[in-house]
């Protein structure tokens, strides 16, 4: 990783940012969690909501018919973050984006993708006001 961070052009990138994460999520290391999740999801009913949801497993708007499968596949699939932002921007064209969660790295990635829009970062109770 240090090599890639020092040589981002080896990936065809401008720069490489290491994200601090709590686990090896979205990798084959956690694939064993797929079956228990699938079993649990098969026990519940999921109906269509009123708010569109986009998943980073395929970056597209979720259909109820594929939601459970997408949730299971998201465990060990790559995150299509930039594509997800592009689809939301194209489909919905929101005036305001809210980034909810710790840190600012992904908020910065969103900001660069939608630089002409408002972005509110909520990473604490205080910042939600």
Across the structure, where does each feature detected by a protein language model lie?
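Short amphipathic alpha-helices in soluble, non-transmembrane regions
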Residues: 1-11
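Residue-level signal for well-ordered alpha-helical positions
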Residues: 7, 112-113
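Structural alpha-beta junctions
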Residues: 12, 80, 116-120
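Acyltransferase
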Residues: 14-111
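Alpha-helix boundary/capping detector
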Residues: 34, 114-115, 123
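Short, flexible loop segments at boundaries between secondary-structure elements
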Residues: 118-129
């Amino acid at each position: 990783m240090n090599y890639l961070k020092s040589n981002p052009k080896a990936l065809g990138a401008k720069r490489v940012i290491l994200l601090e994460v709590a686990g090896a999520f979205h990798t084959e290391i956690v694939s064993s969690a797929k079956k228990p999740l699938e079993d649990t999801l098969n026990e519940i009913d999921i109906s269509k909501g009123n708010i569109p949801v986009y998943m980073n497993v395929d970056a597209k708007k979720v259909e109820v018919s594929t939601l459970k499968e997408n949730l299971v596949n998201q465990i060990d699939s790559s995150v299509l973050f930039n594509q997800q932002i592009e689809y939301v921007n194209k489909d919905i064209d929101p005036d305001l984006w809210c980034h909810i969660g710790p840190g600012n790295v992904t908020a910065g990635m969103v900001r660069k993708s939608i630089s002409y829009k408002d972005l509110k970062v909520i990473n604490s109770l205080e910042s939600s006001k």
